[in-house]
Amino acid sequence: MTVPHSRPDGARLARAALTRLVEPGDELAVQAVAALGPERALALLTGQDRLQPAERDLLADHAGSGAALGRRWSAGLARWAPRAERLDPARDLVALHRLGGGLLIPEDDAWPAALDDLGAAAPLGLWFRGAGTVPVAARALAVVGSREATSYGRQVTSAVVSRAVRAGTCVVSGGAYGIDGAAHRAALDAAPGIRPGPADAGAPGPVPTIAVLAGGLDRFYPAGHEELLRAVMEAGLLLSEMPPGASPTRHRFLHRNRLIAALSGAVVVVEARWRSGAQNTAGHALSLGREVGVVPGPITSPSSAGCHRLLQEAPVRLVADPAQALDLLPPGQGAVGGPARSDAADPPAVASTEPPHAAAARPTDGLTVEELLVCEALPVRRAVDVDALTVSAGLSLPTVLAVLTRLARRGLAERVEDRWRRSDG
């Protein structure tokens, strides 16, 4: 993909900075950019200037008005402040350019319009590595599933993906172990020797697969998939809303899933455990009006328990043949679905009844978003001070202090003199 990199324009620099300043899912930041533009929004979010009355009125059209907006804005400023002094967007842009990548922004002609369906949950930009373009959603099929894939799951994935790629459809997944990796491999195998066309040619080149990652693209994650992700990059694209150096966390993985859903015309879940990120992706797809297909499996297999749960409880379609997966895609080459519903960033949940083979409870189950952000920012071996945690978690100092107290009560955080580290729980 080709986008400007020498002397980047103001919008690209601003959006590069914003991707480091705010965490995915920060709707107020996205609403400020939509109302005031990226450059002005950056100045306000970093505290370089104050929100003027006329700007408050513009923001109110996107984010609501009155005292509630004032409280949200004050909380946002406190949340963004710890990272505001550490922004260097030019450095980030140069770092990705040296790796053959860059930052795709909504102001670019190549920006995938399907992401606009996310509304206030839309990404502020997409960092990329690779030479392909993002196809319209009608020509992209997401294939997702469990990290603990069975031989049955890999076989089904290969059949679905091979048929899709041979039909000229791009396969989108998350680059993880299990079904994701099987999907990318099958796409590459089905399109040997393919090299993407130029980004400025108007129509998308023959991109067989796209991996949407949860961390910065300057390193490959998981490390065991470095060779695979390099192959995906050479034949297709690596995408992430996170800037160089950003670590993948559970919070970022969950928000990454909405991008997989939005970039695709439909989602196929091949295998999923009772609690699975693949179900989260399916929920995002349903909230965006995308079709979701689910592959059934043996009733004795925990790897298919989540699939059967979706088939029972969600408005999904059974996929019993590879051809049925392609039938999920909308006709035509235009954008898919309508504007995101107000719950687009919070996909529909399914009933919580646990089956006999339900996964064991995790120490982090039931944590709020803020608690999860702080918990994931805590190192395991070495203790860090609270100021460092405010930067890593992207939260205000008072919020981090309050959250640390709650985590300590749950046995998830341990104070070492005036520093903190992760506890085993």
Regions found by a protein language model. Give the residues of each.
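Short, small/acidic-rich helices and loops at N termini and domain boundaries
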Residues: 1-108, 398, 410-419, 423-425
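Glycine-biased, small-residue-rich flexible motifs in mid-sequence functional cores and linkers
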Residues: 1-11, 23, 98-101, 105-425
